[in-house]
């Protein structure tokens, strides 16, 4: 216990430590007088504690995702089209591109993972029902082989770095492969009035677990930032 707490104030009721017993490990310590005080501490700081663990997990996943580097040439295409950069793995290739709209659909091999990027009006994505209508129509125009299923649709919001991200999740069907899987859409507000950038991720891996793959795509999506990498 002394080893764990030696670098923290004795009266600190809550602290986070890293790499105590193993690398890439995070430990949360709570000091309280009794069970009631501990319960109150967790209640007051629960979201912060969870975020610390989430950030550690995402950091480890991000290091693994980009262990072979970043596809600078493809990231520069994203930058040229949208004025924003996106970190991508070296094996991603362009499936479909339109610099006028602009629109970009990229992917990598089996298990198939796709990422699409396009712009839309912010006003189209302020209301949940309206947002799904516009998304269906925009996918139909940009990626006709992608159909959004009615079986599952979910929306959520969470604060990002200086911006509120709007997230849509669902199930898609892919006509050409006669299969489908989970997808998400991250909606980023830009500095331009009434404009958003939509970064979508799709996993196509029939009969296999997809949670880790979709999470990896989400980590990639969240690397979107203004200007060059």
Region annotations inferred by a language model:
Residues 31-34, 109-111, 119-123, 172-173, ...:
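Short, flexible beta-strand-to-coil junctions
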Residues 66-96, 222:
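N-terminal "mature-domain start" segment
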Residues 89-142:
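Secretory pathway targeting signatures of secreted, lumenal, and periplasmic proteins
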Residues 30, 37-64, 92, 196-229:
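Surface-exposed amphipathic alpha-helical segments
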Residues 1-29, 140-194, 208-209, 218, ...:
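Signature of long, low-cysteine stretches enriched in small and polar/charged residues
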Residues 55-72, 142-155, 229:
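Short glycine-rich, low-complexity/disordered patches
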Residues 50, 54-76, 102-112:
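Charge-rich, low-complexity N-terminal segments
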Residues 32-34, 40, 44-51, 82-84, ...:
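Contiguous hydrophobic, core-forming segments of folded domains
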